[in-house]
Design a protein with these regions (language model features):
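Conserved N-terminal entry element of GNAT/NAT acetyltransferase domains
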Residues: 1-13
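Conserved GNAT acetyl-CoA-binding A-motif
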Residues: 126-137
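Conserved acetyl-CoA-binding loop-helix of GNAT-fold acetyltransferases
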Residues: 105, 111-124, 147-151
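Conserved beta-hairpin
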Residues: 52-73
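Conserved GNAT-fold acetyl-CoA-binding loop/helix
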Residues: 16, 23-45
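C-terminal "cap" of GNAT-fold acetyltransferases
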Residues: 92, 139-146, 150-152, 161-178
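A short helix-loop-beta-strand connector motif used in the catalytic cores of GNAT acetyltransferases and
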Residues: 43-57, 77-82, 99
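Conserved acyl-donor/pantetheine-binding loop and adjacent beta-alpha core of acyl/acetyltransferases
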Residues: 66-67, 74-102, 110, 164-167
């Protein structure tokens, strides 16, 4: 059972370790999200996000009574550069939008529905905050994530070519009407 909650400030090192392990564990596999250490996501972004209370973690028991981070994501109102040029379906002011960043699950927990549980938690957070839309993006090559988002009710709002210039990648833009 996955327990989703906000990461605490004293968990910043565990959050950083989670993303390092997730990237390393997926590299070269069919689940590779093509993220780069300290580029996407950067440790500065993750530290600032934990400090701001924007990181949500999905916790599981490790079998010995302790918990570990199996999934994580950042939720804030900050769309990346280029979000303003997308033809979103929901007309919403920036403060009416929740943006999902760097959703990931450790490979050891794939196939258990944890990413879906994280997305459901994200929608709950948006509703509770009175948001009108949840928005996110994913690399065009990340077909598994696209399938997940669409199965969760997110609408495909098109492709932004060269969206991640620093990584040389384009992105598919998604939106959920809250």
């Amino acid at each position: 059972m996955l327990k989703v909650r906000r990461a605490r400030a004293d968990e910043v090192d565990q959050v950083l370790d989670f993303y390092t392990n997730m990237i390393d564990g997926r590299r070269g596999t069919e689940f590779d999200v093509c993220w780069e250490h300290d580029v996407h996501p950067s440790s500065a972004f993750l530290r600032a996000s934990v400090d701001a209370g924007e990181v949500y973690v999905g916790l599981v028991e490790d079998g010995e009574g302790a918990t570990c981070i199996a999934s994580a994501m950042v939720l804030n109102g900050e769309g990346d550069a280029g979000y303003e040029s997308v033809s979103w379906h929901v007309a919403a002011a920036p403060d009416e939008v929740l943006v999902v960043h760097v959703l990931g699950t450790l490979p050891a927990y794939h196939g258990r529905g944890f990413a879906r549980a994280m997305m459901e938690a994200c929608i709950d957070v948006a509703r509770a905050a009175g948001k009108r839309a949840v928005r996110l993006d994913t690399f065009t090559t990340n077909v598994r994530a696209q399938s997940l988002y669409e199965s969760c009710g997110f609408a495909n709002c098109g492709v932004c070519e060269g969206f991640y210039d620093r990584l040389g990648r384009s992105a598919v833009m998604y939106e959920y009407a809250v």
